[in-house]
Amino acid sequence: AEDLEVGPGGVHVRGAPGRQVALADLVDGAGTVDGETRFQSNGAYTSAVHVVVLEVDPETATVHVLRYAIAHDCGQAINPLVVDGQLQGGLVHGLGYALMEEAVYQPDGTFATSNFADYTLPSRGIPMEVQPRLVEVHAPVLGNNPQGFKGVGETGTIAAPAAVVGALENALRRLGVHAEIGTLPVTPRRLYELLHA
């Protein structure tokens, strides 16, 4: 395979362009796709742990995320910098879901938060320390994925709201408020209501 090159006329032996097979001939030799063919697709399951340190200001009903740590099982990381960026970007989205992003509808069904003035997004760097750590755990059997690659795009986003809510409930308990948060986002208004229930 190392001696083969793909060129405009097909595939030829490196250094011997006369020894060539047209791409059409290669495709014809591969057979047809019949819709009945099946293959075993083994899952490449990923997991992550999120830990957040935050503080609640009971006077202003605001949350300040101070530190955030992520340990993510990414299998074999092809490009660790890209994985790190996916985790941090996903984290920002998850913090938005947890603390500010809310779809609000009017009683007549009209979407009330249809622009960036009304629908709050994390728009600047969130002032906190983020510590992502990649854990490369290779699954023993991955079938059609022998390199052990796993997904990374969603775990930054999905786990963040749960981690934030757990930390918020813990912070509220320290303030003498025993609340179970069941609605996101935990906006300052909702946090105020929890603090003064």
Spans of features found by a protein language model:
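C-terminal catalytic domains of large/alpha subunits in multi-subunit enzymes
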Residues: 1-197
